[in-house]
């Protein structure tokens, strides 16, 4: 069945080279950049999956190279089973559910399915949806479904196995210069969801079919790094990894690599404005980064809501505040929101998608997108007479 969900109105709006290992005390924490609020602008919002009765959770998205076809996958209930998938052929304005076209076993894949496009060194494209475990939490690690025809058909693939025991599957992936792809994830002892957490990485050289044995790349005494998001510097020479800090006693964490992930610097604090959970972002045509996440910055007026940070790689690298933040969606369920998909369309529209309880009442979480352009946001900053940094 094809369901078309139109624009729907509803009411609701580092990396820092300080001294390595330097962290900030709570007393220092306060907003240090402008904050815009578009969370009440319902004409910007699209419902991908409505949570009238069912909790729709933890989406990720993928935009194909044609600039219009977008996929969204998510789980049922908080960290629950996979199964839902939707496709948009108009850049996220309307969506068609594909659940009944997927392998039967996909509904047995557990926790936060994540969709990626991996191109192997020979140029072969594959779409992948990885999840954390098969059958139940703690089951065989990282099962997946895969498509070799741009998402027209899918087949179930075997789990990657015990070396990949995880809390969540890959939080992010990035192509490397040699044509391989780096993937990053996190776990606790024995793969359990408990402290101390550590971040691991693995590399595929055949488009996702096989992966190297994972190695630990971030472990911080007294902190719990997790949910890594890796991005590349504008000159292409450096990787940066932003990480959630799960004790939530300070800022988020970041680290850098100048050799394609072979070695990483010691994790340090991000700028205040990048403090949050489950970072995911994109680079705009003018070179800036827009990174969305669940706001967990101390003393933030948008704490617990779905926000985006706007700034340059230099801001991240040198610990600067950035240009501004945007409150994208308001959560009516505390901090239970903010696992995002982020896509940039050819007309410069940014489509930021998350799970969120977007209204008061008995309704549960929905998968919702917020749409905006940086030019619009820049102009609003100018109107407040706050110069762009």
Regions inferred by a protein language model and the residue ranges of each:
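N-terminal leader/targeting segments
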Residues: 12-13, 20, 132
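Asp-box/BNR beta-propeller blade signature and adjacent active/binding-site loops
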Residues: 28-389
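Bacterial Sec-dependent signal peptides at the C-terminal "C-region" and cleavage site
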Residues: 18-31
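Bacterial N-terminal signal peptides that target proteins for export
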Residues: 1-14
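Intrinsically disordered, low-complexity peptide-like regions
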Residues: 4, 22-24, 35
């Amino acid at each position: 069945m094809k369901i078309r969900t139109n624009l729907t109105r509803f009411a609701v709006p580092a990396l820092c080279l300080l001294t390595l290992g330097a962290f900030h005390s709570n007393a220092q924490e306060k907003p240090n950049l402008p904050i815009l609020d578009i969370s009440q602008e319902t004409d910007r919002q699209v419902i991908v999956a409505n949570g009238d009765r069912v909790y729709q959770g933890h989406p990720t998205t993928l935009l194909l190279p044609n600039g219009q076809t977008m996929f969204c996958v998510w789980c049922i209930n908080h960290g629950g089973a996979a199964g839902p998938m939707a496709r948009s052929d108009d850049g996220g304005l309307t969506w068609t559910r594909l659940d009944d076209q997927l392998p039967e076993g996909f509904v047995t894949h557990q926790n936060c399915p994540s969709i990626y496009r991996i191109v192997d060194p020979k140029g072969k494209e594959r779409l992948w949806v990885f999840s954390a475990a098969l059958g139940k939490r703690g089951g065989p690690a990282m099962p997946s479904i895969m498509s070799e025809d741009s998402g027209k058909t899918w087949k179930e693939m075997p789990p990657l196995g015990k070396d990949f025991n995880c809390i969540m599957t890959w939080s992010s992936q990035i192509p490397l210069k040699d044509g391989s792809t780096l993937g990053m994830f996190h776990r606790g002892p024995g793969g359990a969801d408990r402290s101390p957490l550590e971040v691991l990485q693995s590399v595929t050289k055949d488009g996702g079919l096989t992966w190297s044995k994972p190695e630990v790349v971030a472990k911080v005494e007294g902190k719990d790094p997790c949910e890594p998001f890796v991005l590349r510097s504008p000159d292409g020479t450096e990787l940066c990894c932003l990480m959630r800090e799960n004790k939530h006693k300070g800022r988020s964490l970041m680290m850098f690599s100048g050799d394609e992930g072979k070695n990483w610097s010691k994790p340090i604090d991000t700028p205040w404005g990048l403090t949050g959970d489950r970072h995911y972002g994109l680079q705009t045509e003018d070179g800036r980064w827009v990174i969305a996440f669940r706001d967990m910055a101390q003393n933030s007026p948008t704490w617990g809501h779905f926000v985006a940070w706007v700034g340059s790689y230099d801001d991240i690298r040198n610990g600067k505040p950035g240009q501004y933040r945007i409150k994208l969606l308001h959560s009516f369920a505390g901090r239970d929101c903010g696992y995002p998909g982020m896509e940039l369309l050819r007309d410069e529209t940014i489509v930021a998608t998350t799970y969120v309880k977007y209204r008061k009442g008995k309704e549960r979480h929905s998968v919702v997108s917020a749409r905006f352009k940086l030019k619009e946001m820049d102009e609003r900053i100018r109107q407040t007479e706050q110069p762009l940094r």
